[in-house]
């Protein structure tokens, strides 16, 4: 762009230069017949009266001669012109100005920003700075991904809902009280202590046949161990057909209270083939036979007949395959957690909600449920934005995906990432290194990085990440010199000066990054090296455990509506009418409580 501008400027100046050439030609035309001596002799006189131009017979000839000379000079200039980029011969990379970039992107007040480093924020109103709010955070264990990025941004309690993947429950424990005081409704999917969790039933969010298909596909994908490859995909395909038949039946025919995975397991057990030589139908076969009579075109029947076309031995193997996939739902804790729904996913785009997904950091057995949650969240939020709210959610939703690599995501996550901005949805992808992202999305990882306008590097010890950051920083042009010395009778000493290029930071320098610094990339800006955010300087730190506030506890009784002691009641004060009606009466808990409250009021 700079070179194009220089060329345009040169052309414009060349055209403008024609005017003084014509003026000079007309000025010297009367003296041209005497040759150069006469022109030189009259030159001082001519310039004493520069606008005293006299036309003569030689005027046209003089103008043409000087224009020809001028044109030849311009031609020689452009033909020999060099394309120099001084101080940029080997690269133009340099560090960005922290204050200038912060001034460009920061909004007021502080809560209207995403905190990137100690001195740089980026405003939440993406229409002002025209950058999306997707952020890729990369840092090794102990680099401060949670403390220096995730927690400060949650503490900001910005004008959006949060979906937070929280290994160990640390973020919830530290910031739960703050979020409630800032008007957030806190909901928790707790896969560590399921008895404390809000219930989550994926069946509630099945709106059409496509949703059922996506649920089953996602369930099989997320329950497949990483790196495993089946030599014979027939069994998984057949098992998925059986599961589709069961889910479609429950979705279309069962009452709401029976639409859950616990009932899927009951149906699977009802269809168990005990004796391969016994041709008698199972209770599940009878159930679908009745459906055949009522609705022979039912979609559940199509999948059930596809599954049921094999021999008894094959069907039994298919059932075992599906039972192995769903074996976690035999646990009472998980069956209870998925029996009803309290998460109300669509409301996240309508009011301030903080949804925490707590997962064990040392056991991934139940992480498949978070994978299903992510998929259905994207479906619900995108549907609400497109069909209810005119294209954009009234309450923006931000996904804080800490330990991103621990949960399976949809294969088309890169496409989801590219279209979520317009709907008011954004994500923070938090990784230990880029190798994790490459392992999850071997072919799409670059697309995912490209759809994040902010990349925050906190430090680490993984070589490919060092190389990537170094290449992202680019090369700068530097001065170098070499020294030469020869000894002897005619010895001499020489110094040669030259320019060279080097990376702004080499890979080993990236590895040696001081633990108090972070490197921030914003699309279209110079890279920034700045201090990591000091959580103790956050204005809301007093409401968190870092500021000595009490830890947040979920799933426990925190409010006592009424406390009544039986011995405080005098039987003589009870209404006489009720005592006369009968000698005794068996009352429910609610009736006893109402009676005691009425007695205390009187």
Language-model-detected regions and their locations in the chain:
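Basic- and hydrophobic-enriched, low-structure N-terminal and domain-boundary segments
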Residues: 1-143, 147-152, 195, 486, ...
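Short, charged N-terminal helix-start/capping segments
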Residues: 1-8, 58-112, 281-307, 326-358, ...
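Extended hydrophobic/Leu-rich segments
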Residues: 39-46, 52, 56, 486-490, ...
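Low-complexity, polar-biased intrinsically disordered regions enriched in Pro/Ser/Thr/Gly
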Residues: 108-113, 224-234, 256, 479-499
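P-loop NTPase motor domains
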Residues: 128-425, 440, 444, 450, ...
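Conserved ATP-driven motor cores of ASCE-family P-loop NTPases powering translocation/secretion/packaging/pilus
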Residues: 417-419, 423-519
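Short, surface-exposed polybasic-aromatic patches that bind anionic ligands, especially phosphate groups
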Residues: 534
């Amino acid at each position: 762009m700079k070179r194009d501008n220089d060329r345009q400027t040169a052309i414009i100046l060349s055209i403008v230069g024609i005017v003084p050439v014509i003026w000079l030609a007309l000025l010297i035309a009367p003296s041209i017949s005497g040759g150069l001596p006469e022109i030189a002799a009259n030159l001082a006189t001519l310039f004493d009266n520069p606008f005293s131009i006299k036309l003569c017979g030689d005027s046209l000839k003089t103008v043409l001669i000087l224009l020809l000379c001028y044109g030849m000079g311009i031609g020689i200039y452009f033909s020999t012109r060099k394309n120099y980029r001084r101080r940029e011969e080997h690269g133009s990379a340099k560090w960005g100005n922290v204050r200038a970039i912060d001034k460009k992107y920061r909004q007021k007040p502080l809560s209207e920003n995403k905190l990137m480093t100690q001195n740089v924020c980026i405003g939440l109103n993406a229409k002002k700075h025209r950058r999306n709010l997707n952020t890729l955070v990369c840092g090794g264990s102990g680099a401060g991904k949670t403390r220096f990025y995730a927690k400060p941004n949650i503490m900001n309690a910005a004008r959006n809902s949060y979906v937070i993947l929280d290994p160990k429950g640390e973020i919830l424990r530290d910031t739960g009280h703050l979020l409630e005081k800032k008007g957030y409704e806190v909901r928790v999917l707790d896969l560590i202590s399921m008895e404390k969790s809000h219930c989550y039933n994926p069946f509630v969010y099945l709106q059409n046949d496509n949703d059922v298909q996506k649920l089953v596909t996602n369930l099989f994908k997320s329950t497949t161990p990483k790196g495993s490859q089946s030599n014979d995909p027939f069994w998984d395909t057949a098992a998925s057909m059986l599961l589709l038949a069961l889910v479609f039946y429950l979705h279309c025919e069962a009452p709401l209270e029976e639409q859950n995975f616990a009932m899927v397991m009951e149906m699977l057990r009802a269809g168990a083939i005990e004796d391969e030589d016994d041709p008698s139908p199972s209770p599940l076969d009878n159930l679908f036979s009745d459906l055949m009579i009522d609705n022979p075109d039912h979609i559940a029947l199509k999948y059930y007949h596809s599954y049921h076309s094999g021999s008894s031995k094959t069907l039994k193997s298919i059932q075992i395959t599906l039972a192995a996939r769903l074996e976690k739902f035999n646990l009472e804790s998980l069956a209870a957690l998925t029996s009803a729904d309290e998460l109300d996913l669509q409301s996240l785009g309508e009011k301030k909600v903080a949804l925490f997904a707590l997962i064990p950091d040392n056991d991934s057995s139940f992480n498949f449920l978070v994978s299903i949650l992510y998929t259905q969240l994207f479906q619900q939020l995108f549907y609400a934005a497109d069909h209810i709210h005119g294209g954009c959610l009234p309450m923006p939703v931000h996904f804080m995906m800490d330990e991103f690599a621990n949960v399976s995501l949809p294969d088309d996550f890169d496409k989801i990432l590219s279209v979520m901005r317009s709907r008011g949805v954004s994500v923070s992808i938090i990784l230990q290194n880029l190798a994790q992202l490459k392992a999850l999305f071997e072919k799409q990882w670059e697309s995912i990085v490209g759809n994040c306008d902010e990349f925050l590097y906190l430090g680490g010890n993984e070589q490919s990440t060092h190389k990537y950051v170094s290449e992202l920083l680019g090369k700068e042009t530097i001065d170098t010199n070499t020294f030469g010395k020869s000894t002897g009778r005619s010895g001499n000493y020489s110094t040669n000066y030259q320019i060279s290029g080097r990376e702004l930071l080499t890979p080993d320098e990236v590895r040696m990054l001081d633990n108090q610094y972070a490197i921030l990339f914003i699309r279209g800006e110079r890279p920034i090296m700045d201090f990591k955010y000091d959580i103790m300087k956050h204005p809301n730190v007093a409401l968190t455990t870092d500021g000595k506030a009490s830890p947040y506890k979920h799933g426990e009784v925190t409010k006592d509506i009424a406390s009544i002691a039986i011995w405080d009641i005098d039987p003589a004060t009870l209404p006489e009418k009720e005592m006369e009606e009968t000698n005794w009466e068996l009352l429910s808990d609610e009736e006893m409580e109402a009676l005691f409250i009425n007695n205390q009021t009187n």
